[in-house]
Amino acid sequence: MPRSNYLFTSESVSEGHPDKVCDRISDTVVDAYLAAMPEARLGVETLATTNRIVIAGEVRGPDSVTFKDLEALTREAVKDIGYEQSGFHWKNNDVAIHLHAQSADIAQGVDAAGNKDEGAGDQGIMFGYAADETPELMPAPIFYAHKILKDLADARKARQGDAAKLGPDAKSQVTVRYENGRPVEVTQIVLSTQHLDESLDSADVRAIVEPYILKALPQGWVNEGTVWHVNPTGKFVIGGPDGDAGLTGRKIIVDTYGGAAPHGGGAFSGKDPTKVDRSAAYAARYLAKNVVAAGLASRATIQLAYAIGVSKPLSIYVDLHGTGTVDEAKLEAVLMDAMDLSPRGIRTALSLNKPIYARTSAYGHFGRAPEADGGFSWERTDLAGKLKSALA
C-alpha cells in the first residue's frame, strides 16, 4: 500500500553551478555539430576549474566545425551564464579542446547497413515518469526547486533591483508535505546563492530572494510554519568552477525527477540523440506524460532497456503505482505499437537531430514547454488521444 501522508524533498542547481557550466558547454558543442550535420555523433565531456576549461571526447562530424569555433562558443556560453570573476572569466579562461574521431568499433554496431537498422549506441536502462502534481505533469518538489532558481537567474540577468547583486552559482531544495497523496505545502526551503556584494549577510540575501521564492510557489504553500535556510553558512562570494571543479553529467537526478522516480544512471549532456541514454529517456518521459495526460493514471513510470547495436528495445515495463484505470501489461503492448522505439524511430518521432540541447542543460530536461523549433518535443501530449482510444 503506497504511503499517502509524507514529506518529500528534491534539489536543483542553477546554470552557474560548476557541473551545470560543464553540461552547458558539452551541449553547446553538441548543438554546433548538429547544426552543421544533423547525423553527427558526439560524446563530449567538459571539466571546469579555476581559470580553465577542458573539453574532451569523441566526434564524428564535419570539418567545418573548428576548434576555434568551439572555443568561441564556449566563451559565449560562460558569458551568458554570467561569469566575469577573477578566478573564472569568460574572456580570460584557458580553453583546451581534445576531441577525436568516434571509435570504428562502436560505429559498426550503431550504423545502419543493408537490411540492418541503426542500433542503439550502448546498452542500458532508461526511465520516464509523470505525475499529475503540476500542470506540467511533474513531481512538485523538483518542479518548484527548478522554478525558484530559474526565476532568480532571469531576475539576475535582467538586473532587476537587488537581484543584480546575486552571482550565477546557486542551489535550491524544497521539502513538500503530501496529504492523501497530494502536495499541499512546503515545510522547508533551502536556498544558497552566490552574491557579488561581499557585505551581504544571510538576512540580506533572504530579503532579496524571498519575493521570488514566494512568487514561484503555489499560493498558500508557504506559511508561518515553513522553515527557511538561506545561505546558512553565511558568506558565499567565491562561486562556480573557481570554488569547486565541475564535470559534465554529475547532476542526473536534478536533470530528471528529483529522486521521485528511478534513474538508469546515464547522463544526458554531451551526447547526440543516437545515444539512448538521452533519446530513450526522452521517449520514456514522452510516453509516461501521455499516459497521465490521457487520464489512464495519476502516476506512471516507464522503463526501457537496450543493447548496443540492437535497434529495438529489449523490454518495456510500466508501473502505474496503483493509480491506473487500465491493465499495465496491456498498456505495455499498446505503447510498443504506438511509437517506434528504435533509436532512429525516437529521433524521427521527436525530431531530435536538431541543435536543441544547450537549453536543456539547466533547470531540468522535463516539465518544460515544447518550443516552436522542436525544443522539448518530448513534452508534447499529442499521443494521449491515440493511447486513450487504443485502450477504450
From Swiss-Prot:
Protein's job: Catalyzes the formation of S-adenosylmethionine (AdoMet) from methionine and ATP. The overall synthetic reaction is composed of two sequential steps, AdoMet formation and the subsequent tripolyphosphate hydrolysis which occurs prior to release of AdoMet from the enzyme.
Annotated InterPro entries: ADOMET_SYNTHASE_CS, S-AdoMet_synt_C, S-AdoMet_synt_central, S-AdoMet_synt_N, S-AdoMet_synthetase, S-AdoMet_synthetase_sfam
Names of the cofactor(s): Mg(2+); K(+)
Lineage of producing organism: Bacteria, Pseudomonadati, Pseudomonadota, Alphaproteobacteria, Hyphomicrobiales
Catalytic activity reported: L-methionine + ATP + H2O = S-adenosyl-L-methionine + phosphate + diphosphate
Co-factor note (free text): Binds 2 divalent ions per subunit.
Protein name: S-adenosylmethionine synthase
Assembly and interaction partners: Homotetramer; dimer of dimers.
Residues reported to bind L-methionine: 58, 102, 244, 275
Gene: metK
Source organism of this protein record: Methylobacterium radiotolerans (strain ATCC 27329 / DSM 1819 / JCM 2831 / NBRC 15690 / NCIMB 10815 / 0-1)
A molecular function GO annotation: ATP binding
A Gene Ontology cellular-component term: cytoplasm
HAMAP family per UniProt: S_AdoMet_synth1
